């Protein structure tokens, strides 16, 4: 099971783009997206142990402190972005200082997260307020197995875990329904993301 890596997009203004970060060691920080499970029937085996996380309705982003250039880098899903207090991603970092603290203590690990509060599902947040929820970590070009990532990132705020156990196709639709598990959200669950416990 491979992470869905869409093509790099050229959308957005070049004025706010930053040069991709320099990496110490192997790998990069590819763009990241999820795709519909209905398109990939049979990718999971009945009974295989999986994690099912809540799919939050927000903006996909990535963060990294590079030991090579000793800089903290902010990226949207498609682009690396200059740290400009006028943009949502920089504001989200300022409002969630635990993220930058963790990145600086764990250099060269890419943190993939969702910014919530910017889309039509507000998760209980007032206008201009954002929260970050982590859903993956990458090191040396490899996504870290999820249980290892949870332990390594125990000081991070993770997307809510909906289910852990044997994969059942019949259960997936049921898990998509109901209220968000984000504390104080007060809105519906957008969906779920199913992952194997061990990357494969």
Predicted regions and their residues:
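Core nucleotide-handling region used for phosphoryl-transfer chemistry
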Residues: 1-200
């Amino acid at each position: 099971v491979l992470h869905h890596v869409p093509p790099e997009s050229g959308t957005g203004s070049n004025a706010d783009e930053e040069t991709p970060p320099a990496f110490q060691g192997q790998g990069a920080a590819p763009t990241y997206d999820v795709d519909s499970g209905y398109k990939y029937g049979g990718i999971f085996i009945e009974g295989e142990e999986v994690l099912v996380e809540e799919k939050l309705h927000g903006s996909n982003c990535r963060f990294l402190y590079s030991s090579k250039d000793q800089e903290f880098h902010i990226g949207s899903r498609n682009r690396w972005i200059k740290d400009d207090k006028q943009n949502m991603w920089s504001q989200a970092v300022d409002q969630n200082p635990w993220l930058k603290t963790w990145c600086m203590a764990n250099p060269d690990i890419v943190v993939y997260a969702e910014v919530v509060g910017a889309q039509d599902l507000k998760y209980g947040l007032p206008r201009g307020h954002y929260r970050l929820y982590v859903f993956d970590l990458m090191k040396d070009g490899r996504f870290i197995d999820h249980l290892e990532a949870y332990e390594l990132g125990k000081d991070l705020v993770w997307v809510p875990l909906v289910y852990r156990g044997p994969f059942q196709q019949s259960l997936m639709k049921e898990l998509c329904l109901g209220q968000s598990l984000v504390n104080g959200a007060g809105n519906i669950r957008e969906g779920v993301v199913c992952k194997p416990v061990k990357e494969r």
